[in-house]
Amino acid sequence: VVDPAPDRRWTATYAAWADELPGWLAPSAVAATVERPMAWGTRAHRIDRPYVVLDTERLRESLDIAGAEVVADRARELTAKTVTLTDGRILDGRRVIDVRGITRSPAFAEQTAYGLVLDESRCQGLEPLFMDWRADNGAPADAPRSFLYAVPLGGGQTLLEETCLAGRPALDGAALRDRLHHRLRSRGIELAGDERVERVRFPVGGGRPGRFTFGAAGGFGHPATGYSVAASLTAADAVAAGETVWPASARAVHRLRAAGLRALLALPPTDLPVFSTRFSLCRPPRSALTF
């Protein structure tokens, strides 16, 4: 395992639909579960599907790599069976899997978000929200849209995050911060100014399915939503065993999801809440673009 900082803490918030997570996932890796999350598009509706927020530190601890050699360095060059490190060393293996993620590029749409972590006691009356597209964040009606994402983190804390689902270019952190502050004030939630901040920016396109790539780099990220953790965890054992995880049917779904991203980027801002409402009302088996 080549990692430039193998001991660093994972600080991002990871979440997934419960039915997409593998059965071997340690129960301790789950920080909170929302049984029927609320979504707001053109109207309020509940999604009949449990949504899980993960404890990132316990998730990291539960992923056992005992027996693997960990090398604290960066990969400079890869082939199917070798890795050249930045210090010049060359590592050999039966297979090399690239999990380095996706390099940012103006050609790729991105998801961005700005979030604050508050004590639950300060969020009275605000229930967990999967996507809340209501227009109370102070943005002009014709501006690119963003939504509020509000989920429990466990331990009496809640994440409130203003999110740009996908943009090319995406909304920047300053714009999302201002929108979040405006939205929270409009809902009677006061800020102290010392809240922990979460910033998000990552490409939602550019992953390439294949035998030697995995995670976001391997196309496991959902192009239209950015979700990738559950798909990566579920496929990890098969990839490690050298099994094929990209049959023709999976590649077809990947292409359809990429088409969904293109459609999403082309929508006028006022149509995004309509799209979200109609999409969220679809049951998972009917939708190849499952969030």
Stretches found by the model and what they are:
Residues D237-F291:
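Long, low-complexity C-terminal extensions of enzymes
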Residues G205-L261:
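Conserved mid-domain beta->alpha element of the FAD-binding
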Residues A66-A192, V204-R208, F212:
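Predominantly flavin-linked oxidoreductase catalytic cores and closely associated redox partners
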Residues A44-R46, L165-G167, G219-G221:
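A short, flexible beta-alpha/helix-coil linker loop
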Residues V1-R43, R58, Y114, L118:
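N-terminal FAD cofactor-binding segment of flavoenzymes
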Residues P50-V52, A170-A174, A224-S228:
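Short, solvent-exposed loop/turn segments at secondary-structure boundaries
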Residues V2, I97, G215:
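Active-site flanking residues adjacent to catalytic metal/cofactor-binding acidic residues
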Residues H45-L59:
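An N-terminal, globular interaction/scaffold subdomain
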